[in-house]
Amino acid sequence: MAFVHRRAFVTASAAFALPPSFASAQAPVANNRGWGMLTRADRDAAYNNNAVVSDGEQITERWGAASARIRSQRPQHIDLPYGRGDRNKWDLFPGDNPNAPCLVYIHGGYWQARNRELYSCFAEPVLARGWSAALPGYTLAPDATLTQIVQEVRDALDWLAAQGSAHGISGPVILSGWSAGGHLTAMALDHPSVRAGLAISGIYELGPIRDTYLNERLKLTDKEVAALSPLRLPGVGKPLAITYGTAELPALVRNSREYHANRARSHAPGPLIPVPRANHYTIMEELRSPNGILARTVMRLMEDSA
């Protein structure tokens, strides 16, 4: 699948529309009238990726092993603190030129699991081009509220803008993240240092999350649902590619499609990129492979930012 060029960036979503048969087959999810009729078990299932991807943990273990190799090969700028929390740390991988663009990748885990160390392997295509990459950690729920997590990501970007040059990174930032990291990418897109973004399989409407097992740790408030749901906020006028796998849970598919439509209504630029047959985990291979659609998307965004 060819990458959408800059002149076609805003209108590209029409070429990536899901077939009507897929859309009509979706189960009741966020904002559907049927959502309120579901049992708690059905609501939990609507957002439980591990229940439908049987090898999700094995895939994550492979990412971790590959990432450990990269960290061992480039140990000079890892575990750099940007705040007081134990997880408030950066792993920086500077490129050949300090002014090269930098991919900042935010990890997923529904804001309550995983860590930045698992995901260094997704910087490989960028590093192979001589560009920079950086991965921030953040405090997980329930030790932090979602309000605090969103602020920590912004604090991390503040630190990188102020201190990155001391570690060989002073170029423009392209922000990306997967799952919860996709949500955090959307929430930090307006940061002054960010030129553009790639949000992968994100959650952009938090209302239904409050009705699931995920809220046992998040404990979302009415104020947070309103203030931290990207779907409820004005579109940021920076390029944001929004992507999902066509084999993902219908709730996640709907989140991405509705968020893109919401941005398009406000003329915010960026394509919607469905990845055929990809589930919540296998979609990430499109970012790790140099020829993957998501890797090529990131490359184009970085080239355009330089």
Features from the language model and the residues they span:
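N-terminal export signals
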Residues: 2-3, 8-25
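Alpha/beta-hydrolase superfamily serine-hydrolase fold, recognizing
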Residues: 9-10, 26-306
